[in-house]
């Protein structure tokens, strides 16, 4: 079964760029985040791209062919241990590869690998969204929303990570950057930020899925709060009933139940017979029924009589 991350990436692979520059921006991010560039000599390069997601591999190959008409090779390897597939795309040294890398903002002529993001490709919002979409497809993770809400992009290179975090933030979300084992993670924890970014990247269907999960979580949490409140009320009612029965025992020893006023005696008999009921429920056992307030006044009267009996007993001693 595909992971939630793989499902989101599959949806993103079906998003078409709104303009030709969008496709270049997306491909630039895909190659920059999950590609490895090899220098073969002056003006000669080769590129290897690895991914565990078939949809990502298909997107890279399609964009490379459609935009630059470069030759690619694909090797699919299966991990017996992890039961996953690994896709290796190779662009061997060939005419046009260096020019393509320069056009994508990955190479700077005469300087080597570009440190930051390709700003020339990111002048329009749709192109910025496409670049972030490519970065997520290449190095992104999103937790199954049935657990915690968490989305992150794993990248290398401090300048690239810092500029990408700012770019993600420009799409209307609060992105945080954390260094992790020599790499960098740009992450979102807010539900609203995650939904906003998914929509911006083009994964509207999964944004709606997450909203539905949150609604279900909200209902479950509300039910849990009500159940916990009811249990707490029952516990408090049980504690109160224990105190009342202890008071009744004192009344029986100090006064005698038969000597109590009829209404108070009825209260004592009912409480002993129904230790689990609240005062309001206890009142409903009378004929005619009595209110919670009436039962409370009977309890207060019992307390007063017991206090008087205790005082009198102490005076006699």
Regions picked out by a protein language model, each given a short descriptive name:
Residues 17-24, 121-128, 258-262:
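Structural motif
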Residues 304-314:
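Short, Lys/Arg-enriched C-terminal cap helix and immediately downstream tail that follows
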Residues 57-58, 62-83, 88-211:
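DNA-contacting interfaces and partner/effector-binding or oligomerization modules
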Residues 1-102:
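N-terminal low-complexity or simple alpha-helical regulatory segments
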Residues 196, 200-302:
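Extended mid-to-C-terminal alpha-helical interaction segments
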Residues 49-51, 152-156, 285-290:
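Short helix-coil junctions and helix-kink-helix linkers
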